[in-house]
């Protein structure tokens, strides 16, 4: 759920293209846009009024899987070029697991997003 549908649709349309997701074309895409990659789909919808908080019951953050560390670095570069604030990274997070490499940032509603590579 998003507060400003047009703003979020534009943000996610650009972000999903940058990480290799494609638009999922379905009826009413203008009201319920979605993007997919492999077997994962991601959808947004206009929310009721109110402000998101990751410290309340519900969503803490969304993590997307990156195919490589280079892909994480490319997205971080894209985030900076598009003036999207990076919370932290890209860097190694050894406290998670060996080789965990990620960048964290926020969407227009303040929802924390992560793009991470975890070596096999």
Q: What do these predicted regions represent?
A:
Residues 3-7, 63-108:
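Vicinal oxygen chelate
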Residues 113-115:
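Short glycine-/small-residue motifs
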Residues 1-42:
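Core segments of cupin and vicinal oxygen chelate
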Residues 36-77:
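Long, continuous compositionally biased terminal/linker segments
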Residues 94-95, 118-120:
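A short acidic/small-residue loop/turn micro-motif
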Residues 39, 108-110:
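Glycine-centered tight beta-turn/hairpin loop motif at sheet-sheet or coil-to-beta transitions
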């Amino acid at each position: 759920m998003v507060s400003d549908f047009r703003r979020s649709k534009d943000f996610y349309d650009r972000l999903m293209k940058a990480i290799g997701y494609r638009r999922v074309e379905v009826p009413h895409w203008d009201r319920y846009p979605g993007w997919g990659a492999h077997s994962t789909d991601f959808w947004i919808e206009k929310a009721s009024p109110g402000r998101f908080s990751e410290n309340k019951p519900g969503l803490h953050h969304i993590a997307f899987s990156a195919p490589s560390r280079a892909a994480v670095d490319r997205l971080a570069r894209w985030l900076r070029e598009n003036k999207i604030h990076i919370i932290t990274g890209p860097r190694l997070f050894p406290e998670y697991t060996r080789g965990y490499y990620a960048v964290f940032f926020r969407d227009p509603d303040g929802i924390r997003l992560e793009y991470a590579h975890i070596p096999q």
